[in-house]
C-alpha cells in the first residue's frame, strides 16, 4: 500500500537502448514484450566468451558516448579525446548490429558481437520491469558527495522511471516485507508489481564519463542508507544497505501500454 500523503508523478523516463551506454530522455515509452520499456537495453555487447561487455566488467566502456535520434531510430557512437582516432559513426537502431559490432570490436581491440532483443537484456530476469526511484532519493545521494549533480546521480544509478513529489526513499513502499509479497500499483494506465530493493553493482562508484572510481562511495552510501531508513521501509528486505530503487514485474497484459511523463502513481 502506498501510504504517505503525497502526490507522486512520473517525472522522467530514461531509456538505455545499449546496455551500459548513455541514456536518452523521452516523454513517453511503451511497455515491451519482456515487461521492460521498449528499446531499453535492446542491444547488448558480447565478448568471444559469451559474456556481456558492460560497466561491471570493463571500465573502458564509460569512455564511449552514445547519442540517439529523437525516435531512437539511430545511434551515433563516438569516443571524445581518443588517441586512436576511433571514428564517429551513426548506425540504424536496432537493426544495424553487424556494423556496430565492428565499431565496438575496433574500440575494444577484441571481437565484440552486438545482439538485439525486443525483450531487452535485464540484469534481473524475474523482476524484469522498469526500475523506479524518486527524484528526492537521487538528491539525497548528491548531498553525500560534494559537487555531484542530480544528472550525474541518474547516470550512475541508471534507473528508468523517476518519481517526483515524494520524499527520499519513498519507492521503498513499492515492495513488501516478504519476497513473494508483491505490491501492486499503477502509473498512468500501466499496472506494476513492486518486487524488491535493487542491489547495486560496481558501476555507481565510477564516473559515468571516465570510469574513474570514487573511493569510499559504497561505504558512504551504505552507511547513510542504514542510518536513514524511513518508517515505511520493509527493512527485512535489506540484507545489506547498498541498495537503491525498486525492481518491478510487469505482466504480459500490459504489453503495448504507454507511460507518459506527468502520469500519476496510484495504489
What are these regions (language model features)?
Residues 1-267:
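Metal-cofactor-dependent catalytic cores
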Amino acid at each position: 500500500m502506498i501510504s504517505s500523503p503525497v502526490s507522486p508523478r512520473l517525472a522522467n523516463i530514461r531509456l538505455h537502448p545499449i546496455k551500459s551506454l548513455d541514456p536518452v530522455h523521452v516523454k513517453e515509452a511503451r511497455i515491451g514484450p519482456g515487461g521492460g520499456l521498449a528499446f531499453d537495453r535492446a542491444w547488448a555487447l558480447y565478448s568471444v566468451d559469451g559474456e556481456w561487455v558492460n560497466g561491471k566488467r570493463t571500465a573502458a566502456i564509460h569512455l564511449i558516448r552514445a547519442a540517439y535520434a529523437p525516435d531512437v531510430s539511430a545511434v551515433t557512437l563516438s569516443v571524445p579525446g581518443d588517441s586512436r582516432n576511433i571514428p564517429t559513426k551513426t548506425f540504424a537502431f536496432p537493426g544495424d548490429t553487424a556494423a556496430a559490432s565492428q565499431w565496438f570490436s575496433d574500440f575494444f581491440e577484441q571481437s565484440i558481437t552486438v545482439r538485439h532483443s525486443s525483450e531487452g537484456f535485464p540484469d534481473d530476469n524475474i523482476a524484469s520491469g522498469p526500475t523506479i526511484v524518486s527524484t528526492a532519493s537521487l538528491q539525497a545521494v548528491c548531498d553525500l558527495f560534494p559537487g555531484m549533480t542530480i544528472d550525474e546521480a541518474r547516470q550512475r544509478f541508471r534507473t528508468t522511471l523517476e518519481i517526483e513529489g515524494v520524499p527520499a526513499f519513498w519507492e521503498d513502499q513499492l515492495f513488501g516485507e516478504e519476497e513473494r509479497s508483491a505490491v501492486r500499483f499503477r502509473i498512468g494506465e500501466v499496472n506494476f508489481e513492486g518486487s524488491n530493493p535493487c542491489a547495486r553493482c560496481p558501476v555507481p562508484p565510477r564516473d559515468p564519463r571516465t570510469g574513474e572510481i570514487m573511493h569510499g562511495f559504497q561505504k558512504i552510501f551504505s552507511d547513510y542508507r542504514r542510518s536513514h531508513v524511513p518508517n515505511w521501509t520493509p527493512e527485512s528486505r535489506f540484507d545489506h544497505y547498498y541498495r537503491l530503487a525498486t525492481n518491478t514485474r510487469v505482466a504480459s497484459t500490459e504489453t503495448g501500454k504507454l507511460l507518459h511523463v506527468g502520469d500519476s502513481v496510484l495504489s
